[in-house]
Amino acid sequence: MANRVVISICGEEYTLVADETPSYMQKVGGYVSDKMTDVMNAAKVGRTDAAVLTAVN
């Protein structure tokens, strides 16, 4: 059965629906948010560019 969880990535809220546990989805959201924040701070880029750079990294 799918679980629904609201997560925050770089201050934006997203609703995830997946068969994974809510705690796992929160952990993934936190990881993505941390990585995007690192990219934005290091490269001085906006959220969209940070998302692309995080995805390819």
What are these regions, as identified by a protein language model?
Residues 1-53:
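N-terminal globular core domains of eukaryotic regulatory proteins
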